[in-house]
Curated annotation (Swiss-Prot):
Region (Disordered): 22-43, 610-650, 768-813
Predominant place of localization: nucleus
Described function: ATP-binding RNA helicase involved in the biogenesis of 60S ribosomal subunits and is required for the normal formation of 25S and 5.8S rRNAs.
Entry's Gene Ontology cellular component terms: nucleolus; nucleus
Organism: Schizosaccharomyces pombe (strain 972 / ATCC 24843) (Fission yeast)
Domain notes: The Q motif is unique to and characteristic of the DEAD box family of RNA helicases and controls ATP binding and hydrolysis.
Gene giving rise to this polypeptide: dbp10
Keywords of this entry: ATP-binding, Helicase, Hydrolase, Nucleotide-binding, Nucleus, Phosphoprotein, Ribosome biogenesis, RNA-binding, rRNA processing
Ranges spanned by the short sequence motif DEAD box, renumbered to the chain: 220-223
Enzyme class: hydrolase
Subcellular location: Nucleus, Nucleolus
UniProt GO BP: rRNA processing
Protein name in the entry: ATP-dependent RNA helicase dbp10
GO molecular function terms noted in the UniProt entry: ATP binding; ATP hydrolysis activity; RNA binding; RNA helicase activity
């Protein structure tokens, strides 16, 4: 460890600490500085560890940057550094640079990072550094909870790679494995347990595990843990953990339920998130298309066919994965192919839809159109989910249809295009969607379909991004005059293209019964989705009416062609508008009723028409211009600005007038400068988790179309032949399966405590405090066995035969009859003895 220091290096370990050291730690240091004071062995160990950590630091660059630029500057031990470099890590990722120093200081951390950003190593490396080695007679000291078995097995593999060179033992506790095998694993007192919440809680209740020795807890993919319904299990596990633990929580997004859980389970947590993840890339180009609800499918096909020009299934060229026929090399070849697919294909496109029913419908429609499509939604099976993602990453498919919930944390390559089939109800959801493209200096496109009912959400997004809204083609001459990276360019799609594709969609849906059923189910699911969708602001709702009534809403988007084409489209649209809005000058009652043929009914209709006509003309005239689309600056003007604009004709008094506002207590009714932009982008420094999490909360609507918290009602019970409340199935009341109450008060199924562990323990030859795994961790085979019989058809027949003769000479492998009688033999001997006594009918000679 001393080899990391040189005479030219300066120890700046104190400046590396982003936050003040705990008062208890300072008191311990003061105690150690006093020579004459008695110190316990545990304090000595902590003091030595802190000194080694400080002496092991090596930093480059400026002091006090608050984060480490390489792994050597983090104060890690040499064994762990060798394991890190052997695994191929050269430099820490951004999430690792921000998280590892905080974890080494013992802080509780809430990290927001997507899958593939290095978050697993961000919490495994500090864990290995914290545990260092196995302690004598110690129980489990680290617990990692993952949402599914695949992620748990992947995490335990990473833990074993980083713990090479140490004697730390790690096990995976997941479903689908026999309980007896996991009884043995947990009875061996492993140092690190990587588990899924359901199976771990089952074993905790069954084995009556004591979790007081846990020092390090990680909730990996925490948003997916809550999404999959593990809230009750997590609450029960959290209640059993000691308060002195260090808790980590990693998530791709930050739902409100997760924030409440973090407040209850973490002590003064630090929110770590990457600023680049919360902003729209400067290289992102976006276009917005006004469509009707019935034309959305045709508009989607128009974007794919005429704008992106996505190749059809026959022209897709997947990435080669090597020798797939060899099963031993197939997995390795697949890993290499997936690793090399990070750049993505130039045509890779992500389509966001509101519900899982839309995923099924839209993906099937795109397949009918000839595209290669992958689909993912929240309740999709994990194996099918991985297959769909791998097909997309390998280039076998170039379209991925997903929901907001299903796309969280998915490790997908850099995308070229993102299409919002439904407009996101929140600006943060829009940023979450389009953040998949325009990464690593590459350009990307985001296309959004906006219906009349979505106009308010579009204006909310415009205020959030602080960009001007360009709607009418008269504002721009060609697409070169538009800046798609700095403006919100809104317009419709060419009507002839949409009409042709709409006719094709209607014909395909009418012919295919399955597609027609999927369309009906998606329409019903969207109605439920609208009930749970957030509403736009009141001001945006008012402006949305003006936007929809303007001519710019129906004019073509400047993305299509030059100005002549746009003008031709406008004339065509104007002609259609005139035809559709044509009103005859006379009603049916007035035709031929003039002069001497005039009737009383015709006169009544003429008077009525003259009275109603001015109102109709006024309502049909659309406004050609919209109110200022840029967000108004409602900040209070400064004194210098007022003096420049308004000149006083004369000084009222030589004495300067005093301001009525007290700078310390006055609260202005004006919004602060750039308040809208700051509300969207401002990220707290992290000193207060509640304040920082308030800006990072992202609640996504469930892709099932219904809200989880509102699940209720009744269901038909076939056994009781009547309707029963669904809530009874969850709390175990009124005839539902028997339950037990956990330590935290959570109701758990009674099957969690079935007595199988007691039966297993009784069948083993060790007690409750004994371990079936040897404590010295070194194993040596002492059993003497006979060599395998010689095979005369092998080349080593004579050599193997010689070994067999030598073994027999030493007495190895010779069967010796056991002198111990079995229970059956003992019983038979007793019966024979009783028969002899009865036959002789006289006592033995000893009793004469």
């Amino acid at each position: 460890m001393s080899g990391f220091q040189t005479s030219d290096e300066v120890d700046i370990s104190n400046s590396l600490k982003a936050f003040p050291v705990d008062i208890a730690t300072d008191n311990q240091k003061d105690k150690h500085e006093n020579v004459g004071e008695n110190v316990s062995d545990e304090d000595d160990g902590n003091y030595i560890a802190s000194k080694l950590l400080e002496s092991n630091r090596r930093t480059k660059g400026k002091k006090g940057n608050g984060k480490a630029s390489n792994f050597q500057s983090m104060g890690l031990n040499q064994t762990l550094l060798r394991a890190i470099f052997k695994k191929g890590f050269k430099a820490p990722t951004p999430i690792q640079r921000k998280t590892i120093p905080l974890l080494l200081e013992g802080r509780d951390v809430v990290g927001m990072a997507r899958t593939g950003s290095g978050k697993t190593a961000a919490f495994v490396i500090p864990m290995i550094e914290h545990l260092k080695s196995t302690l004598a007679n110690s129980n489990t000291r680290a617990l990692i909870l993952s949402p599914n078995r695949e992620l748990a097995l992947q995490t335990v593999k990473v833990v074993k790679d980083f713990s090479k060179g140490t004697d730390l033992r790690s096990v995976a506790i997941v479903g689908g494995v026999s309980l007896e095998e996991q009884f043995s694993l947990l009875s061996g007192k492993p140092d690190i347990v990587v588990a899924t919440p359901g199976r771990f809680l089952h074993l905790k209740v069954e084995m009556k595990l004591e979790l007081s020795s846990i020092e390090y807890v990680v909730f990996d993919e925490a948003d997916r843990l809550f999404e999959m319904g593990f809230a009750a299990q997590l609450t029960e596990i959290l209640h059993a953990l000691p308060t002195s633990r260090q808790t980590l929580l990693f998530s791709a997004t930050l739902p409100r339920t997760l924030v409440d859980f973090a407040k209850a389970g973490l002590q003064d947590p630090v929110l770590v998130r990457l600023d680049v993840e919360s902003k729209v890339s400067a290289d992102l180009q976006s276009a917005f298309f006004s469509v009707k609800t019935a034309e959305r499918e045709a508009a989607l096909l128009c974007i794919l066919q005429d704008i992106i020009k996505l190749p059809l299934k026959d022209n897709v060229r997947p990435r080669e994965i090597g020798n797939v026929n060899n099963p031993k090399k197939r997995k390795r070849a697949l890993e290499l192919a997936l690793k090399g697919s990070e750049s993505g294909s130039p045509d890779s496109t992500l389509v966001f839809v509101p519900t899982k029913h839309h995923v099924e419908y839209v993906s099937e429609l795109l397949v009918q159109a000839g595209y290669s499509v992958s689909k993912i939604y929240g309740s999709l099976d994990q194996e099918a989910r991985l297959n769909e993602i791998n097909n997309f990453r390998l280039g076998k498919t170039n379209l991925l249809v997903v929901t907001d919930v299903a796309s969280r944390g998915i490790d997908i390559p850099l995308l070229a295009n993102v299409i919002n089939y439904d407009f996101p109800p929140q600006p943060k959801v829009f940023v979450h969607r389009v953040g998949r493209t325009a990464r690593a200096g590459r350009t990307g496109w985001a296309y959004s379909l906006v219906r009349a009912e979505d106009a308010g959400y579009l204006l909310d997004l415009q205020l959030f991004l602080n960009r001007p809204l360009v709607t009418s083609s008269k504002q721009v001459k060609t697409d070169s005059d538009c800046d798609f990276t700095k403006q919100i360019v809104l317009g419709s799609l060419p009507q002839e293209l949409v009409a042709e594709l709409l006719e094709w969609v209607q014909r395909i849906v009418s012919r295919d019964v399955e597609l027609q059923q999927l369309s009906n189910v998606a329409a019903r699911g969207e109605k439920l989705y609208f009930r749970t969708r957030a509403t736009c602001s009141a001001e945006s709702a008012k402006r949305a009416k003006e936007l929809v009534d303007s001519k710019g809403w129906s004019s073509n988007n400047p993305l299509f062609g030059d100005v002549s084409v746009i003008e031709a489209e406008e004339k065509y649209a104007e002609l259609l508008s005139k035809v559709s809005s044509y009103r005859p000058s006379e009603t049916v009652f007035e035709i031929g009723q003039r002069g001497h043929l005039k009737t009383e009914a015709a006169e009544i209709m003429r008077k009525r028409r003259n009275k109603v006509k001015p109102k109709g003309i006024k309502s049909e005239v659309a406004s050609d211009k919209i109110t200022d689309s840029s967000p108004g600056n409602m900040s209070e003007a400064s004194e210098s600005e007022l003096e420049e604009v308004f000149k006083n004709p004369k000084e009222l008094s030589k004495k300067k007038t005093t301001d009525f506002k007290d700078k310390e207590y006055y609260m202005s009714h004006y919004a602060p400068k750039e308040s809208i932009q700051e509300t969207g982008y401002a990220i707290n420094s992290g000193e207060n988790f509640t304040t920082a999490a308030r800006h990072a909360i992202l609640d996504l609507t469930n892709d099932e179309g219904i809200e989880q918290s509102r699940k209720g009602g009744q269901r038909w019970d076939p056994k009781k032949k009547k309707f029963v409340n669904i809530i009874n199935d969850e709390d175990g009341s009124k005839g539902s399966p028997k339950i037990i109450r956990g330590e935290s008060g959570v109701k758990l199924p009674a099957t969690y405590r079935s007595g199988r562990f007691d039966e297993w323990k009784a069948s083993k030859a060790f007690g409750a405090n004994d371990s079936p795994i040897r404590e010295n961790k070194r194993y040596k085979h002492n059993k003497l066995q006979t060599p395998k019989p010689a095979d005369k058809f092998r080349d080593n027949y004579h050599k193997q035969n010689k070994r067999n003769r030598e073994a027999k000479e030493r007495g190895i492998g010779i069967k010796v009859n056991s002198e111990l009688k079995s229970a059956v033999e003992i019983r038979k001997a007793r019966e024979l003895k009783e028969k002899r006594l009865a036959k002789n009918n006289r006592p033995s000679k000893k009793h004469r």
